[in-house]
Amino acid sequence: MKKGIALLAAGMMLCGAAASADVLDYLKPIWLQVIDSGSNASEKQIPESVAVICADERMTVEASGVLLENDYAAEAHVYAVLRNNSRERLPIYSVQMTALDAAGKKLHEESYVSHLPDVVEPGETMLASEWMYDFVKDVSKVASIRISIETNSRVNEKWIRNEDVQAWVEGKYLCVKFTNTTDATIFGVVCGATVSDADGQILDMLLQSEYETDDLGIEPGSSVIWRKELEDTAMLKLNTDAVCEAWAYQIESL
């Protein structure tokens, strides 16, 4: 009888200890609970590679990068360079990115993804960049990113690529430099740049909006440098063998 009472008391003490631990955890400040939950989530394996595909048969993905992290919240930086394989000029209305699991189930979707240029000529490329965040508790479920493109029916401008541009990494910044090699002042130059690792995975991307440079005149022989602070996920993977590529466009009305 005494032995049974002792076992019962021990069981009650264990239950009490467990309950006390739960209560103490519940009484933690909310920010500390978030950190604890993030630490547990980050222990789950993050995919080393995620496929990036294009749902539009007119374009194919030439290069991409998906940098996942789950320290305090599930998020992803997604970058892609797509080529227009059709024979038609593509005026881009919007670009969407959808995160899918291995079964093709949608985990998250982002509309109106940043892209450059707004009109993609046949054989030319388009850059796309998006920051996805808080889209799934377990980023290990992400198997692929699907890119969808919606185009306009009319084209009222032409984006002409200019080769007088270069990109490089300086410290924690991705830099892009455009030089006006013509005899006239140039207005409205729009630039973009990527930095990739030795395997071709894009680690970060710089994209300008045409509204940023619409009123900026670059005189003959002058240069302008823009820069973007690299994301933390890019800095962790950046090595001396990084490769940079730059794009520059001038917009002409049709």
Question: Whereabouts are the PLM-identified features?
Answer:
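Positively charged n-region of N-terminal signal peptides that target proteins for export
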Residues: M1-G4
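Hydrophobic helical h-region of N-terminal Sec-dependent signal peptides
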Residues: A6-L14
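Membrane engagement elements in two modes
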Residues: L7, A18-C175, T179-V190, S196-L254
